[in-house]
Amino acid sequence: MDKSLFEQARPILEQIQDNGFEAYYVGGSVRDYVMGRNIHDIDITTSATPDEIESIFSHTIPVGKEHGTINVVFNDENYEVTTFRAEEDYVDHRRPSGVTFVRDLYEDLQRRDFTMNAIAMDTAYKLYDYFDGQQDINNRIIRTVGIAEERFQEDALRMIRCLRFQSQLSFDIATETFEAMRIQMADIKFLSIERIVIELTKLMRGINVEKSFNHLKSLKAFNYMPYFEHLDMNQINVTEAIDLELLIAIVSVKFDINYSLKPLKLSNRQVKDINQYIQIMNALPSIITKEQLKMFVYDYDTHLIKNVMVAADVIKANDIQGHEPLIVNLQTIDETLHRLPMHNRKDMMVNGGVLMAHLNAKSGPWLKDVLRQIEIAIVTGKVSNEETEILKWVDNHVKI
C-alpha cells in the first residue's frame, strides 16, 4: 500500500508534535488508505490553534483562519492543517454560526459527516476510530456520525455528498441515514447551486452512478435544484458514468427545451460544452455520408464527440436517436480527424481581406457565407487549401 504522500507530510506532523501538540492525518486520505485506494489530498488535524501553527511554521497561508484552517507550505506543497474544533449552531442548513477550538480529538471527529470520514491516523499508522468507521467501510456502508437528522440539519450538502460517495465507492447507505435524507432533502434549497454542482459533477462520474442517480430521483432532490426543478427528471435515465454537462445536454434534447443555464452558475467552458453536446446529438442521426462525417468532425470538438458516442447506451435509454455505427464510430472519427486538410478557419489560406480584394467587394453578410462555403469545399476535398486554387474555385462557384 502506497504511503508516500503520508510520508511526504510526516515532517509537518512531527514538527507540530515536537512543539507539544497532537497532530493526525484525517478525512478522505485515511478512508482511502483503509480501503486500499489511491491517496490524493492529505488533511491534517491538530490540537494546536491557528496562531500556534503560524508560529511553528515559517511559510503559512491563513486560508480559513477564522474556521481553524491554515495552509502550511512544505516542499512546495500546500497542506491544510485544521485545529480540533467544535461547531456551534448552524445557520441556513449550510454553515456553523461559529467554531470553538478544542484540545480533544474525539470532540473534533464527532462533528464530521460520515463514520468512514471520521477516522484519524498518527505517524505510526495507528488508527483512531471512535465511531466504527472501519467496520462500516468493511461492510461498504455510508453512515452518519451520530444522529443522521442532526448531521443533515447542520449542513444539507451532506445529503448530496452521501449520494456522491455512494456513486464513487459503490457503497450502500445505512437505513437510518437514507430515511433522514428522505425527510430532509428539501433543505438543499438553502444551499448555493455552486456547491451542489461540484458534488453532482463527481457523482455523475462515479462507478455506481445509476443507483445514486435513481436515489436523486426517488428522494426528489431535483425538485429543489435550480434549472432541474422545472423538469420531470423521473423521465431521465442514467445507466453509466457521464459528464454532468452531457447530462444537462441530454435533458435539453429529450425535452426539446432551451432553458437558460444561468441558474446553474456554470463556467463559460461548461456552457460551451453543453451547447456543443446538444449540437452533436442533434447532428449525429443525419450523418450518412463521408462528406457529412468530415464536416461533423471538423465542426465539433472531437473529445466531446467521443464522449457522446461512448455514452450511446445512456442516450438510447433516454429515447434519443443515435448515430449510424457503420458510418460514425470511434475508428472513423479518428481516421477522419487525421485526414482533415485543416482543423479550423485559421488554417485556411485565404481570409476575408483576401476575398474582398479579389472580388473588389465591400464587407457584408455575403462574406461569412462565402468563407463557410470555402471551408466546406476544402474539408470535403473539392479544392486544395492553397490561395490560388481557392480563388479559382471562388470565381467558378461563388456569386455575391
Swiss-Prot record:
Binding site for CTP: G28, R31, R112, D155, R158, R161, R164
Record GO terms (molecular function): ATP binding; CCA tRNA nucleotidyltransferase activity; magnesium ion binding; tRNA binding
CC cofactor: Mg(2+)
GO biological process: RNA repair; tRNA 3'-terminal CCA addition
Disulfide bonds: none
Catalyses which reaction(s): a tRNA precursor + 2 CTP + ATP = a tRNA with a 3' CCA end + 3 diphosphate; a tRNA with a 3' CCA end + 2 CTP + ATP = a tRNA with a 3' CCACCA end + 3 diphosphate
Keywords for this protein: ATP-binding, Magnesium, Metal-binding, Nucleotide-binding, Nucleotidyltransferase, RNA repair, RNA-binding, Transferase, tRNA processing
Record EC number: 2.7.7.72
CDD domains: NT_ClassII-CCAase
NCBIfam families the record matches: PRK13299.1
Function: Catalyzes the addition and repair of the essential 3'-terminal CCA sequence in tRNAs without using a nucleic acid template. Adds these three nucleotides in the order of C, C, and A to the tRNA nucleotide-73, using CTP and ATP as substrates and producing inorganic pyrophosphate. tRNA 3'-terminal CCA addition is required both for tRNA processing and repair. Also involved in tRNA surveillance by mediating tandem CCA addition to generate a CCACCA at the 3' terminus of unstable tRNAs. While stable tRNAs receive only 3'-terminal CCA, unstable tRNAs are marked with CCACCA and rapidly degraded.
Leftover remarks: A single active site specifically recognizes both ATP and CTP and is responsible for their addition.
PANTHER family tied to this protein: CCA TRNA NUCLEOTIDYLTRANSFERASE 1, MITOCHONDRIAL (PTHR46173:SF1)
Protein name: CCA-adding enzyme
Organism: Staphylococcus aureus (strain MSSA476)
Taxonomic lineage of the native organism: Bacteria, Bacillati, Bacillota, Bacilli, Bacillales
